[in-house]
Regions:
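Phosphate/pyrophosphate-binding catalytic cores of soluble transferases and nucleic-acid-acting enzymes
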Residues: 1-317
């Protein structure tokens, strides 16, 4: 029987402080970081994705950041393929791969090798839903999803066209709710010696951090970033533009909303996103939770995480 390879995952709600902690953890473990963020794969989208800069990486290698143009599509199946490739390359160098990010389903596909089948798509259903989106609008499709799969709908922002369409397409093609499929995926055993950490903090503290982050993004030039993307021809229906902070600002650029209203909407959407993230992670069987307020610093949290990784290694030897 082959010995399982160590894999560390660090996740949690947006703005909880995963980036700083991931650097401390990577240095302690001798690791390399793989971004598990569905938006940070895109170039030219730095401010709205809170993307780490080269200087902030502090010499720690990072993977799956700035690998696609914003016009390109990206999904969980593609992420799984690229992440597994990065994991194998990192392990071959004798380093520890550390998956870091808040896109729960992306993490799940790698941690538990969720199977995909490209042949499972029903092109007729896909085409019909695409036509309905153009004719009826995404709100109508979201209402239908809420009726047939309320658990899935509760985990998806009503404006996230890609995920609404995917969940509804899955149901119409298979007759099965995607929420049930995701629940079954949670019962799979990981092929890795897995340490799965969730960083959280008190809700009001998290909301204050979210509001401060959004304010900082607008000061740093988020409006100009979105305007530049629109000017290069990136449509608001692109996968990249479904990210929070991007699709809201298209209303401002189109003259449908003032800037203050858009900013407040970004704050609210980000808080709702954080709540959905936490709901997802609470369902994860192997997740180990860390409350920021219980520790004095990132270094203290990283030290405890390192202790648990090493303990798990000892137990499996």
């Amino acid at each position: 029987m082959c010995e399982k390879q160590t894999l560390v995952a660090l996740t949690g709600p947006t703005a909880a402080g995963k980036t700083a902690l991931s650097l401390a953890l990577a240095k302690a473990l001798g690791g390399e970081i793989i971004s598990a963020d569905s938006m940070q794969v895109y170039r030219h989208m730095d401010i709205g994705t809170a993307k780490i800069t080269a200087a902030e990486m502090q010499g720690v290698p990072h993977h799956l950041i700035d690998i696609l143009e914003p016009e390109e599509n990206f999904d969980a199946m593609r992420f799984q393929k690229l992440a597994k490739q990065a994991i194998e390359e990192i392990q071959a160098r004798g380093k520890v791969p550390i998956l870091v990010g808040g896109t729960g389903f992306y993490l799940q596909t790698v941690l538990y090798e969720v199977p995909f089948s490209e042949e499972s798509r029903d092109e007729a259903v896909h085409a019909a839903l695409t036509e309905r989106r153009a004719r009826e609008g995404i709100a109508s499709l979201y209402a239908e999803l809420s009726a047939v799969d309320p658990d899935a709908a509760a985990q998806i922002h009503p404006n996230n066209e890609k995920r609404v369409l995917r969940a509804l397409e899955y149901f119409l093609s298979s007759g099965e709710r995607i929420s049930r499929h995701n629940a079954e995926a949670r019962e799979r055993q990981s092929p890795y010696e897995l340490s799965y950490f969730v960083l959280n903090m008190e809700r009001q503290s998290l909301y204050r951090r979210i509001d401060a982050r959004v304010e900082a993004m607008f000061r740093a030039g988020l409006v100009e970033e979105v305007r530049s993307l629109a000017a290069r021809g990136v449509p608001r229906t692109a996968t990249s533009m479904q990210g929070i902070g991007y699709h809201e600002l298209f209303d401002y650029l189109d003259g449908k909303a003032d800037l203050l209203r858009c900013k407040e909407r970004v704050k609210l959407d980000t808080r709702h996103f954080a709540k959905r993230q936490l709901t997802w992670f609470r369902r994860e069987r192997d997740a180990e939770w860390f409350l920021r307020e219980d520790y004095a610093s990132e270094q203290a949290i990283a030290a405890e995480m390192l202790r648990r990784v090493e303990k798990r290694r000892e137990e499996t030897r």
